[in-house]
Each structure stands twice: as structure tokens, then as C-alpha cells.
């Protein structure tokens, strides 16, 4: 049995962190198993627990994807959503070892709230632009291409060109001011009108 002095020395050693007893602990060297390689045993200077390690700087050491997903990333388990990979422009600097910060670069931040008013404005602009081209006043073609009005204004219309507004194609051209009769256009009067 160990004496009282040995017991005191052992307690002092435990407090100082150098436990030499055969009790299993994280820092004590392990005895190699029979048949194992002699260098496979753990070295006597084992690493301190994780809490004693210096804090990892997020600027210099990049966490792997699995660690980023486990650390509460907003894209964990969601493929195709979240922020696209980019160089980190627009991120905040400083504040040491903090958790994943929000990306201030809205060029890549797809999870940001979409500005729906912008798309509503775009839709209105597109609809107005389309209406400007399609909703044309119905009289524009008829007035400009009507042979009757052109004959009255002294501008005889070219019969060889397609008449968009009317099917009236006069065979004879008359100077402005003269009456335009249906006979000149090649129309035949109704028999009732002939009898009158």
C-alpha cells in the first residue's frame, strides 16, 4: 500500500497536470497492444483538449462544406438555393471568429427579399410599349390611303401600290375639285337606278 507521503506527492502531481499513475486518462501514454507496430503508440505529449486550442480564424482557414453545413448555414440541406460561390467581395471585415455572416453583396444574394415592385414596373413598361405598337388608331391607314380623299386633296394615288384601306382603284385620274363618279371606277349602276 502506498504510504501517506506517496499519496500526497501523487495528489500534487495530479493538480500540476502530470499524472503518472496507471489510471487511464486522455494525456497518459497508451501501452502498445501485442502485435501492433511499436511506433503506433500515442506519444507522451498528447494534444490538449479542444477548449485549450487557440481560436480558429475564419479568414485564414476555410471550413469544409460539411462543417459549414453543420454550423448553421442557411443553405444546409438545400441544394440550388442560397448564395452562389463567389470571391467574398462585399463581406464585412473584422469581428474575429464569428459565425457565418450575411452576405452584403446583393449581386449574389439570392435569398434576399426580391424587389417585386421592380418587376411590376417592368411589366407595366412592357405592356405599355407593346400597346404603343399594336393599338394603332384604326383610321390611320384608311385616311392616308383612301383614293377619294387623295383625289380631293390633289394627290392622285398610285394604283400600282397596294391600297391598305380600301379596295377602290380608280382607272382614270381626275384633277382635284372634280366629282368622282362610280362610272369612272368601272362600277355598273343597278338596273333600278338605270330605269330612273
UniProtKB/Swiss-Prot annotation:
Signal peptide: none annotated. Residues 86-95 have a biased composition (Basic and acidic residues). Residues 1-55, 70-99, 153-196 are annotated as: Disordered. This is Putative uncharacterized protein MGC39545. It comes from the Eukaryota. Residues 19-28 have a biased composition (Polar residues). The lineage of its organism: Eukaryota, Metazoa, Chordata, Craniata, Vertebrata. Disulfide bonds: none annotated. Residues 34-50 have a biased composition (Low complexity).
